[in-house]
């Protein structure tokens, strides 16, 4: 299924019409069982949503300031959004939000604009208060005007994307070919990304510098050095988007740009992505919880706000279920991927995202020495496709069992590509035969793209002829994974009935996902969480939730 264009007005004219929810798919899954799985996911996820509604974080509040136009950094490189937030928090706390005290100060004439106010607050020459009565009304009105202007800019960038997709068109084949480019130097990334697009890449992902997810601030400006990646900054987003717009015009197809809204600054990066017209964003709190030890409450709050921004911006999210299989066995833990996909679907839709924006993740990570490994990969991939028929599923290549033998790696990647086209995956991340050896050379990328192009061209519409036997190995395995997923969701709910809080938080603490144990009262960023006080105000949330 070709992924739909990232705009609601274009859904009705997709090349491949959405599959009806009454269509049982190639696996002939029992619709009652599927509905039960979704209901369980909703019941597991709802307490997390309620938790998110009751809290705010430093990054949510800084994102609100950024939407209002606050940018730049002090001479030490600390963003003014951080400086202003810290000053407000020091005077009145975080529980009422940043908007009321900040715009109260502006209305009172403490500064002419946000940037000046941030500079004065950083110097200690401004004191903030919680306004009441008419002062509160004036501060609220002023904050809504300024934040609303930022959200209208996001709306304009979304319409701009829609016009460009209409002008240049989407990729002619499915799945879309997704390629990673990141040297650390944005000025080196741009020509490499443009060349990758010429070689057939439809989506360019600029991975972030190692460890950026643990920074509690967003760096400023264009960057020319990074570690195994390039820093995510607003200027870097703008530069790469401009380069790929040139490629779109040159190639006659719209080339999409991806980055990462995860880690401690998830809401802020989501806001910057919307402002600079990025098209896809990695966005999954579980990755930060499990693999970066970020506090679960912090990142679930951040995730909800960031997904509300993505929904408004028409951005497709990519979730990180593939990461579970880098630490857990891909056969034994297959059901945890399905459970996470079901939960991510619930969380995403609750935040306002639509099916065409749900790039749910999964991966080709079964040990190739396991008998029938390819058949099991097909079963798992087809289960995801049949459970989420209208979602642009993201299919990730083998990494865990890449040994450094480039010939074996090239073969595994070909099988991965074949599985992707047979099972109707939507977004295919190009696998590298040099995985586990070196950061790919340009020649490695060229060979990898040749592999993808050959398989997609040779397979053609083979998926139309692929119909697993209803009682065969593939269908039976898929039903087994779905049954195990339901069993796990029921166990998570049982945790909750014990009265210890949201069952999902207990499951995360127990190491259910990816074998990592992450308790809710620990982890990085916990100090940046605050319970909302009566009278809390966030104009961005008000506007986003009113859509």
Short names for language-model regions:
Residues 140, 144-159, 168-173, 177-426, ...:
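Helix-rich catalytic cores of soluble enzyme domains
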Residues 2-189, 195-200, 208-214, 218-236, ...:
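Long, compositionally biased, glycine/small-hydrophobic-enriched stretches that function as flexible linkers
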Residues 427-431:
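Conserved active-site loop/cleft motifs that coordinate metal ions or position small ligands
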């Amino acid at each position: 299924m070709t992924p739909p264009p990232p705009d609601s007005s274009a859904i009705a004219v997709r090349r491949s019409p959405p599959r009806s929810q009454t269509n049982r798919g190639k696996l002939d899954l029992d619709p009652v069982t599927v509905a039960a799985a979704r209901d369980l996911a909703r019941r597991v996820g709802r307490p997390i949503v309620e938790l998110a509604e009751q809290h705010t974080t430093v990054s949510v509040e800084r994102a609100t300031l950024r939407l209002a136009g606050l940018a730049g950094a002090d001479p030490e490189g600390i963003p003014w959004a951080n400086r202003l937030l810290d000053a407000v928090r020091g005077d009145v706390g975080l529980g009422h939000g940043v908007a009321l005290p900040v715009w109260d100060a502006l209305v009172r004439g403490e500064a002419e604009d946000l940037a000046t106010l941030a500079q004065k607050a950083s110097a200690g020459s401004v004191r903030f208060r919680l306004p009441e009565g008419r002062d509160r009304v004036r501060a609220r009105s002023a904050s809504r005007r300024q934040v609303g202007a930022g959200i209208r800019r996001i709306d304009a960038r979304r319409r701009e994307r829609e016009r460009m997709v209409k002008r240049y068109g989407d990729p002619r084949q499915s799945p879309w070919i997704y390629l990673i480019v990141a040297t650390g130097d944005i000025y080196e990334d741009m020509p490499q990304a443009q060349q990758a697009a010429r070689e057939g890449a439809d989506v360019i992902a600029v991975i972030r510098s190692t460890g950026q997810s643990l920074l509690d601030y967003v760096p400023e400006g264009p960057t020319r050095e990074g570690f195994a990646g390039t820093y995510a900054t607003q200027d870097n987003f703008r530069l790469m988007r401009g380069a790929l717009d040139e490629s779109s015009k040159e190639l006659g197809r719209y080339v999409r740009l991806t980055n990462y809204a995860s880690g401690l600054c998830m809401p802020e990066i989501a806001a910057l992505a919307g402002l600079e017209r990025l098209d896809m964003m990695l966005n999954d709190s579980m990755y930060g919880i499990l693999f970066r030890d970020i506090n679960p409450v912090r990142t679930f709050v951040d995730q909800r706000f960031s997904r509300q921004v993505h929904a408004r911006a028409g951005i497709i999210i990519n979730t990180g279920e593939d990461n579970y299989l880098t630490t857990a066995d891909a056969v034994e833990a297959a059901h945890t991927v399905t459970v996470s996909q079901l939960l991510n679907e619930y969380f995403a839709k609750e935040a306002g995202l639509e099916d065409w924006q749900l790039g749910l993740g999964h991966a080709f990570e079964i040990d190739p020495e396991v008998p029938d490994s390819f058949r099991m990969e097909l079963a798992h991939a087809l289960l995801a496709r049949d459970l989420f028929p209208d979602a642009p599923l993201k299919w990730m290549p083998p990494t865990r069992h890449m040994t450094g033998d480039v010939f074996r790696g090239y073969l595994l990647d070909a099988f991965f590509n074949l599985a992707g086209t047979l099972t109707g995956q939507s977004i295919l991340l190009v696998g590298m035969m040099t995985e586990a050896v070196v950061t790919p050379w340009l020649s490695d990328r060229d060979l990898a793209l040749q592999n993808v192009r050959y398989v997609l061209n040779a397979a053609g519409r083979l998926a139309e002829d692929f119909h697993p036997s209803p009682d065969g190995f593939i269908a039976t395995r898929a039903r087994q994974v779905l049954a195990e997923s339901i069993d796990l969701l029921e166990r998570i709910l049982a945790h909750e009935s014990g009265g210890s809080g949201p069952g999902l938080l207990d499951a995360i603490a127990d190491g259910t996902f990816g074998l990592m144990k992450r308790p809710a009262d620990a982890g990085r960023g916990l100090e940046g969480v605050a319970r909302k006080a009566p009278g809390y105000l966030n104009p961005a949330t008000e506007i986003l939730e009113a859509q």
